[in-house]
Amino acid sequence: MNLCSSGATASTTSLSSTGQAERSGGVPGGGAEGGGGGGGSGNSGGGGKTSDVSAEASTLCFAGGSGTAGAITGTEELSNANSPANGAGGASGSTGSGQQPTGSNGHSHLHNENNANMPPETRPKMVTVKHPESNKPKPTTKKSKPIQADQDVIKALQRCRIKRLDLSKSSITVIPSTVKECVHLTELYLYSNKIGQLPPEIGCLVSLRNLALNENSLTSLPESLQNCSQLKVLDLRHNKLAEIPPVIYRLRSLTTLYLRFNRITAVADDLRQLVNLTMLSLRENKIRELGSAIGALVNLTTLDVSHNHLEHLPEDIGNCVNLSALDLQHNELLDIPDSIGNLKSLVRLGMRYNRLSSVPATLKNCKSMDEFNVEGNGITQLPDGMLASLSGLTTITLSRNQFASYPTGGPAQFTNVYSINLEHNRIDKIPYGIFSRAKGLTKLNMKENMLTALPLDIGTWVNMVELNLATNALQKLPDDIMNLQNLEILILSNNMLKKIPNTIGNLRRLRILDLEENRIEVLPHEIGLLHELQRLILQTNQITMLPRSIGHLGNLTHLSVSENNLQFLPEEIGSLESLENLYINQNPGLEKLPFELALCQNLKYLNIDKCPLSTIPPEIQAGGPSLVLQWLKMHSPYRQIDCYYQYELQTVNQAPGAGGNGGGGAAAAGGSASRSSDRR
């Protein structure tokens, strides 16, 4: 029995790109020509011109669960049918006379009066499309909806004479055998459904070039799929495949194969048959071994085998000489083969989070690489001069390894680099002059190392924008830090600093200054010169007072001074108009808050836990920060003065002969002053 025998007649109805139901011979009266769509121009309505839109431009999309015969998406919008000013007016299905289609329940029915006298078997089929502006609620997901969706799929396939069919996100559970009628299809999109298996009739789509089956529940593929010999792109991401279906190896025309996020444990040697593959994604599976067959895929440009359980790579990987992107991150790799040096077209090599203790010296041959990332391994040193050989590198990430010193190779290895990350290693010093050629270096992360001092030439890092030196053993900052005038982020938390140099005030572009968990007792007055500062973190130090110049930090939104020895807050804190978050908790000597704090109108969060605020009643403190701020406002002398002047003005305006007798006004003011004095 031939699965692909067709029972369709020549008069089968299809949906043209204008969104109009038309027979293969064309429907007179109406139909936009040339551009179609909601706002497209063209010849519209009347005149009896036949629409002749090519099948290549046609697209049928199905909106699942709507209960309609089908919905049209893309550039065509039938909701614009009521606008006679554009070409879509004809495309909406209105008659040549311009009669507006009508419907009920927010739906517009395609209708043509000229069809009334036609025999029933030759009339164009009706398509119902929901208006976007309809207030009718969309149906909720119910058990019965997929059944309705499957029925609508059958109807859609019966009309199928197009080249691109989109049935994605439609709650489809079954693809009917009538799919064999769609022999003209070149693109079929079935992603985000509930399909458990494909019918054998899928093999009848011999013109298919793009098949998207991602986000379903497929566990296998039918053998008949091998008949789709022109298939170029196959997407099977997010399914339930326990192996690569054998039929895939017979699809010799494949150029792109997505198998991400399945349950695949092995790759068969038959993979070598897919010699036309340029992109292969096996990401997020359970693969433990990648066989030598990978070396036969000489046209590969992208290979993603990340997030698997690979321990080794075959030497044959070096045969994939056209690879530009190789992602090996989040595996269990113990080594990288020397043949990796053959991949001279390699631009991106991801080796993050494996079990590597070294990398091969042959990597220096991959001179096209612009990023080198081995984060999260156990590497102690790089081959001599390797980074210097990779002169195109702009980003180097060596974080979370076992480096005890900077890589050998001198200043030349950082010539074109703008970002260096050596976080979480065991480096105890930054070599003098190591960045002397790194004129473009803007970001340096040395967090969680063993630094006790900074190099004397730190003042030459003039282009530095972000400097992270947190969690080291630094005891002082050199005065030359003043030369880093492009610095915007300075992280010095968890060190052993006792003071901050006055020259800190020269860092006029600084936005974030983090000094948490040091031994600082006093902040320099020059801190007030950092007018761009937005976050100042002083938590867990030994600070007894804040400088009054802090009131000049008009852009400050976050201030943390918790866990210190504050005795008071300066009145100037009321000048911080942008302040949103203030942490002053756990200051055992802080007994009162300045009334000026109530002037911080943008303050959203105030933490005063474990502060002995003796001047504020306990019941107010128990009510939380918002009640404390309200109490400060109510008892602020500024509020009393304001009330005094408001009362005085009101009294003057209400006095007999106000404005004409200065003495009367003075008396009233005096009375109000007396009452204000009594209140005080």
Curated annotation (Swiss-Prot):
Residues 1-19, 73-86, 97-106, 669-680 have a biased composition (Low complexity). Keywords: Leucine-rich repeat, Repeat. LRR repeats lie at residues 161-182, 184-205, 207-228, 230-251, 253-274, 276-297, 299-320, 322-343, 345-367, 368-389, 392-413, 416-437, 440-461, 463-484, 486-507, 509-530, 532-553, 555-576, 578-600, 602-623. SMART domains: LRR_BAC, LRR_SD22, LRR_TYP. Residues 1-54, 73-149, 658-680 are annotated as: Disordered. InterPro entries: Leu-rich_rpt, Leu-rich_rpt_typical-subtyp, LRR-SigEffector_domain, LRR_dom_sf, LRR_R13L4/SHOC2-like. Pfam families: LRR_1 (PF00560), LRR_14 (PF23598), LRR_8 (PF13855). Belongs to the SHOC2 family. This is Leucine-rich repeat protein soc-2 homolog. It comes from Drosophila simulans.
